[in-house]
């Protein structure tokens, strides 16, 4: 069976929507945080009434909504370019900085896409220029330039190394050794990065500066197979493997009519 290949634009839209859903659809029931404060509360912030859902561990907002008001109203929105629209995130952080507890320059653009008349924009949080794994801040902008709510997974008080003690080459060898029959399977490194990897515990968070690698066997590149790959995170200070995870592919056996093997830079990494 032959099917058309999904476009890069469609993939980008799906990734942005997934990020927004992951941050906005969280913990629907109220509760108490670790310090006794409610996880959901209504506050007055600089004269504006807001509904906030707090992360019980980080005490950073998961969701902020304006009550009978917008978080931000962008003037002449219809005339703005995509690049100008991507500057909205830092403006939003600057306005609600004491709630979000990060700096505007800690944002790094993840994606911005227009669907119908609505823009969907998302960012990573960074620490000294390094992305925090699975961090996010996302929101939508309606045709009038109004932002009604935001969703976020942020880490206000990151304590992590700012340099690496072991080399990239050492970390890569450690990562490769985690995969049985690495050479026999003709595994390839299809994505890599340096990340800050937060590990949540009961009452605290450990932060690791890691080399993140995504490996895939050669046969996994063909869309007719469900063969997956592996994500390996190696601590840049000790060489310890702090994450080893199987990367699954969606089930299916349809080969696009114009299929060609993807280039490494076209493969979506796990972060």
Task: Specify the residue positions occupied by each region the protein language model found.
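N-terminal secretory signal peptides that target proteins for export/translocation
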Residues: 1-9
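Segments that shape or occlude catalytic/ligand-binding pockets
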Residues: 32-271
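Bacterial N-terminal signal peptides
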Residues: 15-26
């Amino acid at each position: 069976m032959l099917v058309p290949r999904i476009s890069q634009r469609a993939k980008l839209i799906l990734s942005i929507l997934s990020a927004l859903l992951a941050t906005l659809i969280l913990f629907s029931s109220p509760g108490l945080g670790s310090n006794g404060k409610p996880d959901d509360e209504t506050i007055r912030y600089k004269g504006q009434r807001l509904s906030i859902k707090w992360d019980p561990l980080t005490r950073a907002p998961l969701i902020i909504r304006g009550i009978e008001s917008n978080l931000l109203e962008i003037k002449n929105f219809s005339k703005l370019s995509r690049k100008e629209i991507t500057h909205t995130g830092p403006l939003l952080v600057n306005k609600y900085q004491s709630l979000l507890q990060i700096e505007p320059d800690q944002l790094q653009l993840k994606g911005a896409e227009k669907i119908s008349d609505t823009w969907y924009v998302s960012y990573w949080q960074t620490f000294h220029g390094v992305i925090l794994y699975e961090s996010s801040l996302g929101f939508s902008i309606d045709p009038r330039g109004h932002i009604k709510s935001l969703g976020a997974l942020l880490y206000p008080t990151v304590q992590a190394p700012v340099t690496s003690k072991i080399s990239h080459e050492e970390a890569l060898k450690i990562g490769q050794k985690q995969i049985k029959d690495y050479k026999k399977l003709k595994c390839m490194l299809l994505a890599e990065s340096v990340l800050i990897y937060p590990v949540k515990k009961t009452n605290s968070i450990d932060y690791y500066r890691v080399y993140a690698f995504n490996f895939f066997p050669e046969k996994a590149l063909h869309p007719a197979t469900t063969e997956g790959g592996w994500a390996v995170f190696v601590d840049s200070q000790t060489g310890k493997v702090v994450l080893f995870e199987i990367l699954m592919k969606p089930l299916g056996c349809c080969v696009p009519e114009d299929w060609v093997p993807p280039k490494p830079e076209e493969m979506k990494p796990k972060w």
